[in-house]
Amino acid sequence: MEHGNMLAIVGSPGSGKTTLAVKLAAEIAKKKKNVVVVCSDPFVPSVPFLLPMDMEQEVSLGALLTSPALTQNEILEACVSVPANEYISLLGYRMGENLMSYPKVTRERAVEFLVCLRHLADYVILDCTSVFEADVFSILAMEMADRVLRVGTSNLRGISYFKSHAGMLEGRADNGKYISAIGNFKTGQEWEAAAGQYGGVGFVFPYVAELEKQYDEASLWNGLTSKEAGPFQTEVKKVLVEVFGLYETKQGENKPGAEKKKLVVRSPFVWKNKGEF
C-alpha cells in the first residue's frame, strides 16, 4: 500500500491513543521531519495537559473550524510549538471548551481544514475523540486520512466499545486503510482472545508505568528511559514503518545519493522545501 502523510487514531477510552499520538510524533521529530498533532477531542481537550502549565494556547481548533474564512497562514499561526522540539506543533481545543463553545462545525469547513493541513507539514497525526459519532471533524478525519489506527483494550469495556462502534466503521475499512492495535495491555490480560474480537491486531502496546507517570505529570514529550519501555518503543517504530514507511536510520547513515540540506528555521516549524504560503 502506498504511504501517505496523514494518520488518524481512534480508540476506546483508556486505550492510550493520545499517548500513542505523542510518542509517534516524537519519534518522527527525531528524523528531523515536521509533524502536526491535532487533538480533536472537544469533550476532553488534551492540549492543556500536553503542554507546561505556564504555556498559553491562543487559538482553539474550534475557532479555526468555525472561522468564516480559513487560510494556511491562519492554521500555521494557531499551531502551538512543543517546548524543546521545533519539529512538533499542536492544534486542539482550549481548557474549559467543549463542543457547545462554538457554532456547529460544517463538513465543508472540516474538509477545507484537513486539505490545508495536509500540505503544511511532512506528517499529520489526527487524535480523534472516542465519541466520534458526535463529532463531524473526527468522522471526516477518518475518511480523509491515508491510514486509520484503531486502538482498543484487552478488557471487556474495550471490546464492548468496539462492538458498539464496529457498525459505524463498516464500509470504510477498505484497501487496508484500517489497522488495529491493542493498547495499555497489562500482564495477565488475554490479548489473543481480545485480538480475535477485534478481527486481528497488528500491534500490541504494553502498559508502561513510566508512561503513566509522564501522563500524570504532563511530561509525555520526555523520552522513555526504563527497561520495560523497550517493547512499547519497538511497536511505535513498527507503526511508523507500516503507516509512513519511516524506517529507523542508524546514526551517520544516509540513503544512497542523499545530500545534506541546510535547515531554515521558520517558527513554529523547521521547513524543508515546503514552499511559501
List each model region and its residues.
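Walker A/P-loop phosphate-binding motif and the immediately C-terminal alpha-helix
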Residues: 2-43, 47, 117
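Phosphate-binding loop that captures ATP/GTP phosphates
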Residues: 31-88
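Conserved beta-strand segments of the P-loop GTPase G domain that flank and frequently precede/overlap
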Residues: 38, 92-93, 125-127, 149-153, ...
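Cytosolic-facing regulatory segments adjacent to core modules
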Residues: 72-83, 89-132
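Inter-motif core of Ras-like GTPase G domains
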Residues: 119, 135-155
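Well-ordered beta-strand positions
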Residues: 123, 147, 200-203
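Beta-strand-loop-alpha "switch" segments that mediate conformational coupling across diverse proteins
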Residues: 184-226
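NTP-binding/hydrolysis catalytic cores, primarily Walker-type P-loop NTPases
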Residues: 217-277
